[in-house]
């Protein structure tokens, strides 16, 4: 993995531009307010899969507020009932609910 410089800070990144780390840890490693849009599909905790464990929401929102610009956007994919939990966990940042019909 090559180190690249972003606003004077070194951020681990692959050649393809992908950050290879825990999402919360990754957001906190970025320069403050350096992200225009965060698009993520976090685990919902609605299955019995070992990896499907909901993120600690307080830590998640702290990381989002750190990395995303004040006028930036944070978009989360989620399914019911986790979408309600996620939205209610930070009403101050909740703006819209978009529904993707497949």
Feature annotation, model-predicted:
Residues 2-102:
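Core catalytic lobe of class I
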